[in-house]
């Protein structure tokens, strides 16, 4: 089995031809992107052919999305029963790489469609209840049981879409996370001012 791991972005600029080559040559592909607009394009262009060939295209496997995606999956499996919502709170230190910074600037002009909280989901897999409970939040607040202040996490917009896609794909494979499952991600800060 051949696998290509790509770790340098912006992926919308450098990754499309690489993914196309992987599908053509029947190699699996994974990367660390947070560029959901680009991932949506990959899904539209390559999902069916890759699936028919048994090829896995797995974007968003870096530090940004993996804790949220695997964390939600782990939570569901540990409960051993249907779960309707998972919220995660990330406290992070450090900054962004040059590629991440460039990506942030290129995403500013995205269409309303690309800002959809379910942009990565398979078509017709979203209920009205899920849509209502899955809006991007920019509120700063204190939550019972969580020490500190919660606010918008730097990668929340990217990560929430990744987790929602995973949940939808699991549901299509008869392994649902829960009825009308929703997911939220928040930054965790020591003071209100930092949030």
Task: Tell where the protein language model's regions lie, with residue ranges.
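Rossmann-fold NAD(P) dinucleotide-binding segment
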Residues: 1, 12-31
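Gly/Ser/Thr-rich loops at beta-strand to alpha-helix junctions
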Residues: 36-38, 62-69, 93-94
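Active-site-proximal alpha-helical scaffold in enzymes
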Residues: 68-78
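C-terminal catalytic/substrate-binding lobe primarily of soluble NAD(P)-dependent oxidoreductases
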Residues: 54, 77-195
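Rossmann-fold NAD(P)-binding glycine/threonine-rich loop
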Residues: 15, 20, 33-55
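General beta-strand structural signal in soluble alpha/beta enzymes
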Residues: 31, 57-59, 88
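Short glycine-rich anion-binding loops that position phosphate/pyrophosphate groups of nucleotides
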Residues: 10-11, 62-63, 125
């Amino acid at each position: 089995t051949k696998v290509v791991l790509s770790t340098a972005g912006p992926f919308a600029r450098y990754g499309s031809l690489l993914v196309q080559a992987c599908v053509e040559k029947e190699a699996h592909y994974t990367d660390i992107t947070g560029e959901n607009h680009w991932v949506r394009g990959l899904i539209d262009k390559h999902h069916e052919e890759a699936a028919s060939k048994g090829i896995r295209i797995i974007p968003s496997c870096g530090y940004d999305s993996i804790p949220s995606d695997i964390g939600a999956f782990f939570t569901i499996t540990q409960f051993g029963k249907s779960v309707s919502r998972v919220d995660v709170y990330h406290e992070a230190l450090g900054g962004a790489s040059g590629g991440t910074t460039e990506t942030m600037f290129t995403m500013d002009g995205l269409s309303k469609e690309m800002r959809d909280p379910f942009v990565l989901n398979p078509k017709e897999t979203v209920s009205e209840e899920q849509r209502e409970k899955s809006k991007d939040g920019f509120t700063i607040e204190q939550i019972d049981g969580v020490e500190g202040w919660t606010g918008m996490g730097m990668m929340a917009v990217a990560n929430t879409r990744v987790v929602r896609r995973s949940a939808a794909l699991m549901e299509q494979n008869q392994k649902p996370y829960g009825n009308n499952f929703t997911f939220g991600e928040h930054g965790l800060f020591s003071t209100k001012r930092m949030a």
